[in-house]
Amino acid sequence: MPKLRTTSDQFFKAKIFNQNITFVNLSNQPTYVQSRVLRLKSKEPETIDWIESIPVTDTLFDVGANIGIYTISAGARGIKTYAFEPHSGNFNILCQNISANNFPCTAYCIAFSNKSAFDIMGVKNYHPGVADNTINKNKEYNHGVVVHDLDSLVEVNALPQPHHIKIDIDGHEDKFYQGAKKTIGKCKSVLFEIETQYEYIVDELKNQGFKIIGKHKRNENEHNFIFSK
């Protein structure tokens, strides 16, 4: 269980995997990050266990990184981690969290899809930590976003081929998968939060040689699937 201690109004420190980690406090939600860190093992224990199973010499992609709770956790183990987060407020805090820790993590403000384009992302609000942001769907607020298919970026070596990939993208699973099939197929393991309407992806991953080693209910409409080869 992570241990927490506040060091200032701006930052607080915790401990995970026997490493000290630092996070930025959110002024609009002063207990949000603290509660997320303290609930790491209870909220998504399968995610922490999966991160703990990754060899430290491997590379991880965290797609839909939010403010970097799991990015930093992976970095604390020495795993080279690439974090992708298109929400402007989340990306700002994600970068600050990476900067506050001397871990091998890099962040990119990009959304992955099945095409290369400028698009619109619907967001609940602009507060850091917000989730359930969706590409090209109406929300109360919107902002522009650069989208790209992951396969093309890996093929031209703009990004490395990851060994492992974590995907949490709030209803955008279909278009993401269509643009990332080749890259995913070459991974050792995948943690994919999938809504029920997109569970065809499970069968496709099985056809690529993956086995389901974990299935964890997140709510009535989505599960965390863990796949391995």
Regions found by a protein language model. Name each.
Residues 1-152, 155-157, 201-229:
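S-adenosyl-L-methionine
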Residues 18, 27, 114, 123-125, ...:
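Non-catalytic surface loops within mature trypsin-like serine protease
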Residues 59-69, 142-199:
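Active-site segment flanking the S-adenosylmethionine/decSAM binding pocket
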Residues 86, 110, 195:
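Cofactor-binding loop segments of dinucleotide-utilizing enzymes, especially the Rossmann-like FAD-
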Residues 88-91, 116, 173-174, 198:
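A structural helix-start
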Residues 117, 174, 219-223:
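Conserved catalytic loop of SAM-dependent methyltransferase domains
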Residues 118-120, 177, 202-203:
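Short, well-ordered secondary-structure micro-motifs
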